[in-house]
Swiss-Prot record:
Gene: PHYHIPL
Protein name: Phytanoyl-CoA hydroxylase interacting protein-like
Function in brief: May play a role in the development of the central system.
Residue list for modification Phosphoserine: 12, 15, 25
GO cellular component: cytoplasm
Organism: Bos taurus (Bovine)
Domain Fibronectin type-III positions: 52-161
Keywords, comma-separated and alphabetical: Glycoprotein, Phosphoprotein
Family: Belongs to the PHYHIP family.
SUPFAM superfamilies the UniProt entry points to: Fibronectin type III
Superkingdom: Eukaryota
A Pfam family reported for this protein in Swiss-Prot or TrEMBL: fn3
SMART domains associated with the record: FN3
Alphabetized InterPro entries for the sequence: FN3_dom (IPR003961), FN3_sf (IPR036116), Ig-like_fold (IPR013783), PHYHIP/PHYHIPL (IPR042868), PHYIP/PHIPL_C (IPR045545)
Disulphide bond pairs: none
Amino acid sequence: MEVPRLDHALNSPTSPCEEVIKNLSLEAIQLCDRDGNKSQDSGIAEMEELPVPRNIKISNITCDSFKISWEMDSKSKDRITHYFIDLNKKENKNSNKFKHKDVPTKLVAKAVPLPMTVRGHWFLSPRTEYTVAVQTASKQVDGDYVVSEWSEIIEFCTADYSKVHLTQLLEKAEVIAGRMLKFSVFYRNQHKEYFDYIREHHGNAMQPSVKDNSGSHGSPISGKLEGIFFSCSTEFNTGKPPQDSPYGRYRFEIAAEKLFNPNTNLYFGDFYCMYTAYHYVILVIAPVGSPGDEFCKQRLPQLNSQDNKFLTCREEDGMLVYHHAQDVILEVIYTDPVGLSLGTVAEITGHQLMSLSTANAKKDPSCKTCNISVGR
């Protein structure tokens, strides 16, 4: 059941019930606040005989849809023509403010067999907590409604992007990836204190940590996947890593074949921007059969390491040759520990450009290049 968009351009912020949008078998209507249980609109009357929904159950949750069902007494059940569904983000469940963002969504659906699917990327975001309550209603010949009491309030959380959604992001990223440039090392910038700590407390090996919440809000790796962040960008004129970095003046460099080789798998993780012209692609490299590999295999689209638009490893004349996409900034996550003895640590000669950091960066939800038609 597709739910039509609720127009934010309400005629009167104090009279939300005036706005009704109809779409064949389904209608979306902005009702008054749930407080007091009854809607105050003059076109909706009370009728105690209508059954109140109880034991509400939410199932089949995705990033932008869910199924809802409930139980109700058979008394007057045949008089029900519509269901009123009050859906709000959890943090706004007691709010009746009509802003451009996070407008509470009240829906009216024709009474259909349960469970009923509620779908709509314009009011459902991934990985977000919501509250939902339901009324039963009977539409009268004059257009008025008689309604039941509101049900209890149920809470649920939407899901992450699925592989299908990530594949859509992948396809959009491929469009702008550009030509491939040769490279030979992965690198990771940090402060000197970071590397000192690794040597003293972690046996000279960098340890995976949980990825932050940068990028798409629905990305299944944010706050869940453990890994170590690397870059592989090169300067166009030198073919070497740039001397500037937003992450620290000390750089660990490691030969590309130490991290990316036939014994690893490559996955697409995300595609985003931060209100700038730069676009970022997150890739994950995981040793075959490792915990990180199993995590990604269940959640992320796998890429052909020898043939993709972002990062390749091919054998030429008995040697592994590496290329990266020119027109996107790659953020590479390696899912296993990496010993400092496998590479070198040295101070860079450039600047620490903090403004370019993507730590916990929020994705621009309005960018047409890197967004898909599901919750942002």
